[in-house]
Design a protein with these regions (language model features):
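Gram-negative bacterial Sec-dependent N-terminal signal peptides
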Residues: 2-31
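Periplasmic alpha-helical coiled-coil/stalk elements that build and connect Gram-negative outer-membrane
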Residues: 2-3, 14, 137-249, 361-364, ...
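Cleaved targeting-peptide boundary
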Residues: 30-40
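A glycine-/polar-enriched beta->alpha junction
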Residues: 40-50, 57-72, 101-119, 128-136, ...
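Amphipathic alpha-helical coiled-coil segments
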Residues: 51-66, 134, 138-157, 168, ...
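Small/polar, glycine/serine/threonine/aspartate-rich low-complexity segments that form flexible
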Residues: 77-108, 230-240, 272-273, 285-332, ...
Length: 452
C-alpha cells in the first residue's frame, strides 16, 4: 500500500508547475503584447473613443463660429432687371437696370454676442472633459479586457493542473483497489472529481476564448497574447493611504464634475444673455453701391435711348432698444433661471455621485489588497496542508478523499490569488479614474509590472 501511495507524493505541485509552463510557454513562438502596445492600438481603433475625439474636434469649430460675432460681416450683392412698358401713344419703353452693392456691419456694442462667445468657450471646455472621460474609460476597458484574458489563462492552467493531479490520484486509487489495499469508494471519489475537473476545464477554455475575443475586438487585432505580470509580483501601493484626499482630488478633477460646473456657468450666462435682450445694441453699418440704367424709347417713327451711371456710399450707426416684447423677454429670463437651478442641482448630483464612487473604489482596492495578502498566506498553508495530507495518506492515517480535498483547496487558492492580483491592478486604475486622475502615464506605470 505504501509503495503505491508513494507514487502520488508531491505530484500535484509538480504537475501544476508543468501545466503552467505549458500554458505560457506553448505560445513562445508568438510575440506577446504589452498593455501599452494594446492601449495605443485601441486609441486608433475603438469606435467609442474615436467618436468622442471627433465630437471634441467639432466643438472647437463651433466655438470659432461664436467668435465670428465679434468681427465685422461683409456682403456683396448684384442684381439685374429688365422692364418693358407699352404706352397708349404706341411707344414702348425698355429699361435695363444693373446694380452692385457692398454692405458691411459691425456690432459696436452687443452684450448678447459677448455672452454667446463666453458660452461657446465653456461649451468647448465641456467637450474636452468628455474626451478626457472617454480616454479614461478606454484605459479602464483595455486594462480590464487585458487582465481578464490573463485571469482566464491562469484559471485554465490551474484547472488543467488540478485535473492532472486528480488523474494521478485516480490512477493510484485504481492500483490500490486492484491489489486490495483500498476500497472501490476511493476510486469512485477520484473518478467523480476527475469528471468535475473535465467539465471545469471545458468551461475555463471557453471563458478564455470569450475573453480573448473581447480583447481582440477592442484593440482591432486577432489572437492577442497579453504579457503576464512579472514574477515575483510587486503590486503598487495605494497612495494616499486615506480616502479623504482621494475624494478631495475627485471633487476638483473629475471630468463629470468639471463638465457640470461648466454647464452651470453656461446656464448663468444664458440668464445674463436673456437680461441683455432688454438692453441697447449698437451696430456700425456701411454700404457702397453702383448702378447702371439704360432706357430706350421706340415707336413707329424712331427709336431713342439713354444711359446713366450712379454711385452711392453710406456710413451709419444703428441703435436698437426694445420697448415692448409682449412679455417674451421676462418669460425667457424666468425660464433661464429655472434652467440655472437645474444645472446647479446637476453639479450637486455629480459631486455626490463621484464622492460615492471614489469611496467605493478606494475601499475596494483596500479590500482586494488585503485579500491578496490573505490568499498568499493561504497558498503557503495550502501547500503545507497538501504535503501533510499526502504524507498521512502514505502512512495510512488519511483517506483518498482528504488528498482530493487538499488538492482542490490548493488549486482554488492559486486561481483566486492570481485573479485577486489582477483585480488590484485594474481597480487601482478605476480608483484613479474615480478621482479624475487617470491618464496615459498610468498605463505606462502598469506596463512596468509586466514581464519583459
Amino acid at each position: 500500500m505504501s509503495t503505491h501511495r508513494a507514487l502520488i507524493e508531491n505530484q500535484p505541485l509538480k504537475r501544476l508547475g508543468l501545466a503552467l509552463l505549458l500554458a505560457f510557454g506553448g505560445a513562445s513562438g508568438v510575440q506577446a503584447q504589452s498593455l501599452q502596445e494594446l492601449y495605443d492600438a485601441a486609441r486608433a481603433f475603438d469606435a467609442i473613443y474615436l467618436a468622442a475625439a471627433a465630437l471634441a474636434d467639432s466643438a472647437q469649430y463651433k466655438a470659432a463660429q461664436a467668435d465670428a460675432l465679434a468681427r465685422p460681416s461683409v456682403g456683396l450683392g448684384l442684381t439685374g432687371s429688365h422692364q418693358r412698358s407699352d404706352i397708349p401713344s404706341g411707344m414702348t419703353v425698355n429699361s435695363d437696370l444693373l446694380q452692385a452693392g457692398l454692405t458691411a456691419k459691425y456690432a459696436v456694442f452687443n452684450r448678447g454676442n459677448a455672452l454667446t462667445i463666453s458660452q461657446a468657450q465653456r461649451s468647448l471646455g465641456a467637450a474636452r472633459t468628455d474626451l478626457e472621460a472617454a480616454e479614461q474609460d478606454l484605459i479602464v476597458r483595455v486594462a480590464q479586457a487585458y487582465f481578464d484574458v490573463l485571469a482566464a489563462k491562469d484559471a485554465l492552467s490551474t484547472t488543467r493542473a488540478s485535473k492532472a493531479a486528480i488523474a494521478e490520484q485516480l490512477a493510484s486509487a485504481k492500483r490500490n483497489f486492484e491489489v486490495g489495499t483500498a476500497t472501490i469508494t476511493d476510486t469512485r471519489e477520484a473518478q467523480a472529481r476527475f469528471d468535475l475537473a473535465t467539465a471545469a476545464e471545458i468551461g475555463a477554455d471557453n471563458d478564455l476564448r470569450i475573453k480573448g475575443v473581447t480583447l481582440d475586438q477592442l484593440v482591432g487585432r486577432v489572437g492577442v497574447l497579453p504579457k503576464p505580470l512579472a514574477v515575483p509580483v510587486a503590486l503598487p501601493a495605494v497612495m494616499p493611504v486615506n480616502v479623504e484626499p482621494w475624494v478631495s482630488q475627485a471633487d476638483q478633477q473629475h471630468p463629470s464634475i468639471r463638465k457640470a460646473r461648466l454647464g452651470l456657468e453656461v446656464a448663468q450666462l444664458e440668464t445674463s444673455k436673456a437680461r441683455a435682450a432688454e438692453g441697447v445694441t449698437v451696430d456700425l453699418t456701411g454700404t457702397l453701391g453702383a448702378q447702371h440704367l439704360q432706357n430706350s424709347l421706340s415707336g413707329q417713327a424712331a427709336t431713342t435711348s439713354g444711359a446713366g451711371n450712379t454711385k452711392n456710399a453710406s456710413l451709419g450707426i444703428s441703435l436698437n432698444y426694445p420697448l415692448y416684447t409682449g412679455g417674451a423677454t421676462q418669460n425667457r429670463i424666468m425660464e433661464t433661471l429655472a434652467l440655472e437651478e437645474k444645472s446647479r442641482n446637476d453639479v450637486d448630483f455629480a459631486r455626490r455621485s463621484v464622492s460615492e464612487g471614489t469611496r467605493r473604489a478606494f475601499f475596494g482596492v483596500q479590500s482586494l489588497t488585503a485579500q491578496v495578502r490573505a490568499l498568499e498566506a493561504a497558498e503557503s498553508s495550502s501547500k503545507l496542508a497538501l504535503e501533510a495530507t499526502q504524507l498521512g495518506y502514505k502512512v495510512g492515517v488519511r483517506v483518498n478523499l482528504d488528498v482530493l480535498n487538499a488538492q482542490t483547496q490548493l488549486f482554488t487558492t492559486q486561481r483566486d490569488l492570481a485573479k485577486a492580483r489582477y483585480d488590484v491592478v485594474v481597480n487601482g486604475l478605476k480608483l484613479r479614474q474615480a478621482a479624475g486622475q487617470l491618464n496615459p502615464a498610468d498605463v505606462a506605470a502598469v506596463n512596468q509590472l509586466l514581464a519583459k
